[in-house]
Amino acid sequence: MGPTACVLVLALAILRATGQGQIPLGGDLAPQMLRELQETNAALQDVRELLRQQVKEITFLKNTVMECDACGMQPARTPGLSVRPVPLCAPGSCFPGVVCSETATGARCGPCPPGYTGNGSHCTDVNECNAHPCFPRVRCINTSPGFHCEACPPGFSGPTHEGVGLTFAKSNKQVCTDINECETGQHNCVPNSVCVNTRGSFQCGPCQPGFVGDQTSGCQRRGQHFCPDGSPSPCHEKANCVLERDGSRSCVCAVGWAGNGLLCGRDTDLDGFPDEKLRCSERQCRKDNCVTVPNSGQEDVDRDGIGDACDPDADGDGVPNEQDNCPLVRNPDQRNSDSDKWGDACDNCRSKKNDDQKDTDLDGRGDACDDDIDGDRIRNVADNCPRVPNFDQSDSDGDGVGDACDNCPQKDNPDQRDVDHDFVGDACDSDQDQDGDGHQDSRDNCPTVPNSAQQDSDHDGKGDACDDDDDNDGVPDSRDNCRLVPNPGQEDNDRDGVGDACQGDFDADKVIDKIDVCPENAEVTLTDFRAFQTVVLDPEGDAQIDPNWVVLNQGMEIVQTMNSDPGLAVGYTAFNGVDFEGTFHVNTATDDDYAGFIFGYQDSSSFYVVMWKQMEQTYWQANPFRAVAEPGIQLKAVKSSTGPGEQLRNALWHTGDTASQVRLLWKDPRNVGWKDKTSYRWFLQHRPQVGYIRVRFYEGPELVADSNVVLDTAMRGGRLGVFCFSQENIIWANLRYRCNDTIPEDYESHRLQRV
């Protein structure tokens, strides 16, 4: 069939479909057939035009397809027509740095760059720090992409370390090599002593063979002893020669020995008294009346030659101490009228229960039954400071609390609420302390200069730390030969550079410099913890009970008797630089928990603590988080965002850092716990002006732990005290503190090593 026939058939089909192909029967067929043919011809013309247009479009599409390639559409060659190519790899199709390829099925993104994971179009950073690529105790910092490790910790050396990708992080760990300080000379052991290298640090041991002494006094050839100025030492071979402020020399027995310095004998319990009597007349030459239990006051109530600390019947009344309701007062009848813990013979309120036996004014009548607790001759019911003597009863803010005991004397706050135990009421506590010395700016006599002691010798309102004329005598401190004592004439008869007005007693406090623990502060003369603040660090709940503190030896010995919640006994004296030493002894074999001491105390959320655990143990209260204590000595900086409570309690128990609570500054690498009924002597040096901290522990004459230099400035000074946590029968004996702002020689070498 030819093209014309096909077109005719197609036209007839269309006519039938439209009803135009029907020819009625009968009638005149010629005119009608002519008319039908004309209509058919017109329809064919329409079909022909339609087909011509379709052929043209098909030709155009054919040409377009033929000129298509993999890189996009080429311009059409049909005259008068053009096509703009559409790119498949448009900007942003793939992640930056990822190769985009166009395929027959569309754009395809390559793999994500190293350090990222994803499908190429969407890539996320990989945290390589999860692979622990850094050396232990070195912080890993994740970047995008990659990671880098901070510098090797003190005591180690190594190159910087960084990389990209998990594969690299897993197979390439940071390498830090231990520095042998004993070989490099970076140690601070005294000459002629043994230096023992440890991982990341070192320890100073005893004197080498042929030498005698220790790390405090130095090691000298046997038979040769010298004072720090090079002169021959007059001291016993177990004593240190000390140069006093006035240039004189004194002798102090070394740790583990006791006596007058010219003669020294073994001191097993480190309480300052020799095991056997020495041939000297001083008190410290007497035989210790408790050889194995520290009792620096040598108390002996029944005078039987056995000290109360180790006498099973201290008062000699035939009733053992454990059963005696007056263990230090004879009372064989054990009469107890008010049925409290104390027998009538020693009860300061016989007819009223008062287990604490508190007696504020020391008049022999307990506070519980004393109608004038503070002894200011104003009865308690009318006294606006019933526990603080204030004869004038002044009350500036009219809140019913006298100025003498008001923690916000200029602001009405009758409830006296003080949640952080810093003696500043919450109503006026701003917590703004720009110099970090523990005194808020509005109460700081040197708000921009750290001076925790707040010493103000001339009482002019400006602290000595920022006053260029401390004694207000008109002579600037830089030229004043008695900086703390007014002497405008600057008399100095012996021309030794020290004015006559302060010769031998620099602060004019009537205590000679040789025995004055703070010769440049008239407010502090002797070590004394008889007045102290108790701070309970877990005040809520019933996990345990609060500590029970007993002070002996005129404030130089503290005993804690109960298995208690964490607690502090804090002295009221604040220090700038200080040396703090004491003997620590657990006088029981029934427990294995924490005991220690604190320094830099500013409030119940801010202080340093040195704490010693005997055995590893998980704290029995798992809320708010699991806390695990490891054995050994730990130095921690407490900066708690919550203050006393469960969070701080568990953070103190836990060995390690706890976010927003506690930072572990140092831990004894030996992981050795304290021994039952064994005495240890500690020595602390704290110089808050530069952040210098160093603590050492001795067992007998042997140095057993040394933190070496630790630098931290979280607390720029503060108060001292002792610490316990769930441990009973702790003795802190022979306590001594001394103001000292002199920077130790090992500070600079350690600082340079860190840099």
Curated annotation (Swiss-Prot):
Q: Which cofactor does it need?
A: Ca(2+)
Cellular compartments annotated: Secreted, Extracellular space, Extracellular matrix
Composition-biased stretches (Basic and acidic residues): 332-341, 353-368, 412-424, 456-465
Task: Indicate the secretion signal residues.
Answer: 1-19
Residues of the region (Disordered) are 296-341, 353-501
Output the Gene Ontology cellular-component terms. extracellular matrix; extracellular region; extracellular space; protein-containing complex
Instruction: Tell me the ranges holding the TSP type-3 repeats.
Output: 266-298, 299-334, 335-357, 358-393, 394-416, 417-454, 455-490, 491-526
- Domain TSP C-terminal residues, every copy: 530-744
Q: Where is this region: Mediates cell survival and induction of the IAP family of survival proteins?
A: 525-755
Q: Which SMART domains match?
A: EGF, EGF_CA
Q: What is the effect of changing residue 65 to E?
A: Equivalent to human variant V66E involved in CTS2 disease. Reduces secretion in tendon cells and nhibits oligomerization. Mutant mice develop inflammation and fibrosis in Achilles tendons and carpal tunnel
Keyword Glycoprotein listed? The answer is yes
User: What is this protein's tissue specificity according to the annotation?
Assistant: Expressed in cartilage, including nasal, knee epiphyseal and rib tissues. Abundantly expressed in chondrocyte and tendon extracellular matrix (at protein level).
Q: Which residues form the EGF-like domain?
A: 85-124, 125-177, 178-220, 223-265
* Matches recorded under InterPro entries: ConA-like_dom_sf (IPR013320), EGF-like_Ca-bd_dom (IPR001881), EGF-like_dom (IPR000742), EGF_Ca-bd_CS (IPR018097), Growth_fac_rcpt_cys_sf (IPR009030), NOTCH1_EGF-like (IPR049883), Thrombospondin_3-like_rpt (IPR003367), Thrombospondin_3_rpt (IPR017897)
Question: This protein's superkingdom?
Answer: Eukaryota
Posttranslational modification: Proteolytically cleaved by metalloproteases ADAMTS4 and ADAMTS1 with ADAMTS4 showing more potent activity.
Region COMP N-terminal: list its residue ranges.
21-84
In-chain residues carrying the UniProt-annotated modification Phosphoserine: 394
Provide any one GO MF term from the record. heparin binding
UniProt lists the family membership as follows: Belongs to the thrombospondin family.
The task this protein performs is described as: Plays a role in the structural integrity of cartilage via its interaction with other extracellular matrix proteins such as the collagens and fibronectin. Can mediate the interaction of chondrocytes with the cartilage extracellular matrix through interaction with cell surface integrin receptors. Could play a role in the pathogenesis of osteoarthritis. Potent suppressor of apoptosis in both primary chondrocytes and transformed cells. Suppresses apoptosis by blocking the activation of caspase-3 and by inducing the IAP family of survival proteins (BIRC3, BIRC2, BIRC5 and XIAP).
Subunit comment for this entry? Pentamer; disulfide-linked. Exists in a more compact conformation in the presence of calcium and shows a more extended conformation in the absence of calcium. Interacts with ITGB3, ITGA5 and FN1. Binding to FN1 requires the presence of divalent cations (Ca(2+), Mg(2+) or Mn(2+)). The greatest amount of binding is seen in the presence of Mn(2+). Interacts with MATN1, MATN3, MATN4 and ACAN. Binds heparin, heparan sulfate and chondroitin sulfate. EDTA dimishes significantly its binding to ACAN and abolishes its binding to MATN3, MATN4 and chondroitin sulfate.
Domain remark in the UniProt entry: The cell attachment motif mediates the attachment to chondrocytes. It mediates the induction of both the IAP family of survival proteins and the antiapoptotic response.
Q: What is this protein called?
A: Cartilage oligomeric matrix protein
